[in-house]
């Protein structure tokens, strides 16, 4: 499946617009990850713990969006946008939303 941030796919004609499609993931960040990330930040390094969590959440949201597009009969998703939001009273949750337009192209 072609997934792109552009509104069209070069060299392909969009034959049918299936509709807007979403993929959402909410991921909690636990105490051990917070502690490891805090040490990394203290010593001036990058927080691989949080980066890995972010990458994993983004990949899951994209896959969920792709699966929903397939269920709609699409073979591509155009105009993809990914949003990130921190949730919870202690900012302990990360929400990643992938959205786009499911299309059928030649």
UniProtKB/Swiss-Prot annotation:
SUPFAM superfamilies: YbjQ-like (SSF117782)
Pfam family, one: YbjQ_1
Organism placement in taxonomy: Bacteria, Bacillati, Bacillota, Clostridia, Eubacteriales
Official protein name in the record: UPF0145 protein CLH_2273
InterPro entries noted in UniProt: UPF0145_dom_sf, UPF0145_YbjQ-like
Gene3D superfamilies tied to this protein: Hypothetical protein apc22750. Chain B
Family per similarity comment: Belongs to the UPF0145 family.
UniProt xrefs under NCBIfam families: PRK01119.1
HAMAP family given in the database record: UPF0145
């Amino acid at each position: 499946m072609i997934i792109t941030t552009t509104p069209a796919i070069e060299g392909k004609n969009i034959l049918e617009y299936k509709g807007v499609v979403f993929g959402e993931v909410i991921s909690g960040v636990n105490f051990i990850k917070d502690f490891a990330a805090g040490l990394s930040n203290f010593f001036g390094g990058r927080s691989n713990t949080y980066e890995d969590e972010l990458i994993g959440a983004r990949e899951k949201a994209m896959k969920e969006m792709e699966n929903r597009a397939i269920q709609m009969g699409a073979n591509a998703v155009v105009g993809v946008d990914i949003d990130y939001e921190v949730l919870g009273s202690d900012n302990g949750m990360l929400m990643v939303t992938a959205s786009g337009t499911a299309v059928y192209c030649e």
